[in-house]
Amino acid sequence: MAAAWSWRASHSTITMTSGSLVVLFLLLSIWQPAVQVEGRRQMANSQEMIKDHLGARSQNKTPAITNNANQSSTSSADLDDGAADDDDNKADLPVNVSSKPYWRNPKKMSFLQTRPSGSLLTLNCHALGNPEPNITWYRNGTVDWTRGYGSLKRNRWTLTMEDLVPGDCGNYTCKVCNSLGCIRHDTQVIVSDRVNHKPILMTGPLNLTLVVNSTGSMHCKYLSDLTSKKAWIFVPCHGMTNCSNNRSIIAEDKDQLDFVNVRMEQEGWYTCVESNSLGQSNSTAYLRVVRSLHVLEAGVASGSLHSTSFVYIFVFGGLIFIFMTTLFVFYAIRKMKHEKVLKQRIETVHQWTKKVIIFKPEGGGDSSGSMDTMIMPVVRIQKQRTTVLQNGNEPAPFNEYEFPLDSNWELPRSHLVLGATLGEGAFGRVVMAEVNNAIVAVKMVKEGHTDDDIASLVREMEVMKIIGRHINIINLLGCCSQNGPLYVIVEYAPHGNLKDFLYKNRPFGRDQDRDSSQPPPSPPAHVITEKDLIKFAHQIARGMDYLASRRCIHRDLAARNVLVSDDYVLKIADFGLARDIQSTDYYRKNTNGRLPIKWMAPESLQEKFYDSKSDVWSYGILLWEIMTYGQQPYPTIMSAEELYTYLMSGQRMEKPAKCSMNIYILMRQCWHFNADDRPPFTEIVEYMDKLLQTKEDYLDVDIANLDTPPSTSDEEEDETDNLQKWCNY
């Protein structure tokens, strides 16, 4: 070996010293015997393992390939009680023989159930016994438990939960008892958020070598929130490269592929394929079938030779690495003085930043899609560590969040000049600004915000991108997301929200609620006629019709969420907010006395269900606000329960004073208790077009001494019986 190495060294292009050759000779002399001994030991161990494996499987003579996707599971309590010793024998017991409880089919009982949110889960604990046992369900060790959201159904042996949410996660235990004993089974339930994606590979099949007539298996597990289809595809081969063109599907909807009494013709490639509506994923492994142990021994010996070659390559590479390291150290020494000066001036600062990741829906903004509602973008925030260099005493720049760059909407911060604050809430505020000599509004978060507040602002921005532009909605103009806080730039409405605008410009005679000690208000800046009010309602209907065509549900349509722009163009705002109905307290009274429940449809009050028809109900309430110059609907109702009882009884708000019957008819159509009876926004727009095109002269509205009782009188009931006749005027 030393001679061989000396010959290679003499022909090498690298000049080495005699000391290096001596060190290399010693390393090889020590390493080679160790490798040979290790190779023989691994070969012997492989032989023993294969013999033991064959001995354990020699008694199993069943068909060549079987498939089993569900492994049998028996709880520890079953084993303690002896209930799982012989399930088949117990199933054959006579009816009059006393027996403590035992599981009817323990192989179908699993210890772990993973489901996406919004799906249905059924836990089954079917047991037998004499006398007939009873069952008790526990969640996290508690017997008296309920769900915070969704229905819960307990049948004889099953527990069913619909519309799963992350709050349903936990340990569920079924305890079955009779007078002779008890058994129990635990199931861990995990509910994960839905993510639209093609199947994601979790565990793929591994290459497998089996001796003829032995047994083995391959495993394949994918994660998919959508309905998926799985299949195993087989390609026969004689060696990994000499393969047939014939492909066949040998199993479907199985996570595990079992090989029992394997034959030579079963050698080949096995591919696990799973697909859903968004695509497919696959993973492939090779099954090698050998006739005897000698083939495996030859493979082990060949592997030993490859290991020896690897040692030579490793040592040679190590010498090159040492040589390059020496050159690097020499270069570093020459630069040491310069580096020392730089270290005195530059300090490395490690910071933790948060990366904002946006999962955009595929086809979520397509109005021609088959979905009833628009798919909201998913926003995730992940922590990551970054390194920043600080020069001298100047503080290092720090950005708490890292946002993805969208070049189609990004604006330079230097073009943005912030001005006065227009309004602010608990965690966000809106500021007037100027961009390229144009007045805009900028949305941002306040100090003390949380990650959820950032995610909500990002989600609102992404929804506005998906929806697009329309004259009667607040449109997105751009954003500033790089090298600083997130600014969402939208259109500016100089006249504020519609509710305040109507109240400021209400006609004289609507001051009965004003304190007599206060001076009379100044005349309105703009005299609003009934035709102006109808134009306002028409613009809002057009904006809502556009949002409905984009599969967007507003959920909070009210005069306070409609802004008045230049030339009294109305624009619907806050349609991009992703509201969590379960976590938002819609029943709590705000400090200004407004109750958002008064704009909600009956199905939203009772079932938290929202769709375009629930927005139509809210539009009817908004229409009433317009015709009363921003008055509060249902002034005497102060709770959700009272409002729902009021609506269930068939009562509705009366027609505002001097409001035309045509407009009130539209209100009543929007307030149908059955959502299917409410007109869509497309028909509302057509109805408004007819009203505006009529030759009838509209009088200026002068609503003096207006009284809005909470119920509908009998006289108005006679008028509403002829709604269809008025609609076809």
UniProtKB/Swiss-Prot annotation:
InterPro entries (alphabetical): FGF_rcpt_fam, Ig-like_dom, Ig-like_dom_sf, Ig-like_fold, Ig_sub, Ig_sub2, Kinase-like_dom_sf, Prot_kinase_dom
Pfam families linked to this entry: Ig_3 (PF13927), PK_Tyr_Ser-Thr (PF07714)
Domain Ig-like C2-type: 106-192, 203-279
Modified residues (Phosphotyrosine): Y587
Reaction catalysed by this enzyme: L-tyrosyl-[protein] + ATP = O-phospho-L-tyrosyl-[protein] + ADP + H(+)
Region annotation Disordered: where it falls in the sequence: 56-101
Residue intervals on the Cytoplasmic side: 331-729
Residue span(s) of domain Protein kinase: 416-692
Biological-process GO terms, alphabetical: cardioblast differentiation; central nervous system development; defense response to Gram-negative bacterium; endodermal cell fate determination; fibroblast growth factor receptor signaling pathway; germ cell migration; glial cell development; glial cell differentiation
Signal peptide (from-to): 1-36
Extracellular side, ranges: 37-309
Identification of the protein by name: Fibroblast growth factor receptor homolog 1
